[in-house]
Regions:
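Short amphipathic alpha-helical interface segments
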Residues: 5-30
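Short, cationic-aromatic polyanion-contact patches
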Residues: 2-9, 23, 55-78
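Short amphipathic alpha-helical interaction segments
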Residues: 33-44
Length: 78
């Protein structure tokens, strides 16, 4: 089961990387996996900090978290 969750998480990542911000419904349709697998995998990605989940007017949207850019000052990196 853990392996399958990881596989679906990878599919979610690739879908979001290609499509940007999508609704939960669009995501579930787009990767053509059972809703239970999508939700478990999405939870994993959210817990690991890889995706952001927002809700407005009872519609959930999901997007990849942007990589934080390192700020360089002199010889120090923050």
């Amino acid at each position: 089961m853990i392996t399958e969750i990881g596989i679906v998480a990878g599919e979610i990542w690739n879908f979001l990387d290609t499509h940007g911000t999508v609704s939960l419904e669009e995501l579930a349709r787009g990767i053509e996996r059972p809703q239970e697998w999508v939700l478990m995998s999405l939870g994993w990605l959210a817990r690991e900090g890889h995706v952001l989940v927002d809700c407005k007017d009872d519609v959930y949207t999901i997007r990849l978290r942007e990589k934080q850019k390192k700020q360089e000052v002199g010889n120090s990196t923050f």
